């Protein structure tokens, strides 16, 4: 996919979501690096989303994953000292509903505080599980649709007080060997060290 100028909020979310799909397929296939198949997925999805021929999947899928994952910290995989965390902080307009709530251990919850999820991810220097990023993107998209922000220019949103930081949406992802789908995959890694 050739570099193209992304101006609108909608295009930025679509680009981030298409790159997420690319990463998702590579992690699912346990690839060490991205290949032409992954790039093709990204290009087709981005084009399909832009042209209105494809849609982002429903948050219902993410709710099913949340229920299947069970009571673990969705960030680190810990089963200790769990609480509910708002993905979009209520302080900045995040809703108090199931779609915006996930389990978080005391340590991650305290570390994240009222920060934007992507801001917190960047400060940690470690990518979050892909399913959490996917949920974040879907919440961002829904918020923008509901508040008539989806067709705005990106710079119009950067100074607004929103429950997300539009300029921090991930548009590139690390190599698949450094990514995980869900926090539960980290539990075994914790005991190896």
PLM regions: where:
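Short, charged surface segments at domain edges that flank catalytic/cofactor-binding sites
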Residues: 22-72, 131-138, 142-149
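A broadly tuned "polar low-complexity/structure-edge" signature
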Residues: 5, 11-19, 103, 110, ...
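Detector for Asparagine
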Residues: 19, 38, 55, 74, ...
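Intrinsically disordered, low-complexity segments enriched in small/polar residues
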Residues: 12-15, 73, 118, 171
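Generic preference for hydrophobic/aromatic residues in regular secondary structure cores
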Residues: 12-15, 20, 82, 139-144, ...
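A detector for short metal-coordination/catalytic motifs
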Residues: 110-193
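Histidine-centered nuclease catalytic patch
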Residues: 72-128
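Nuclease and nuclease-like effector domains acting on nucleic acids or nucleotide cofactors
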Residues: 1-52, 174-193
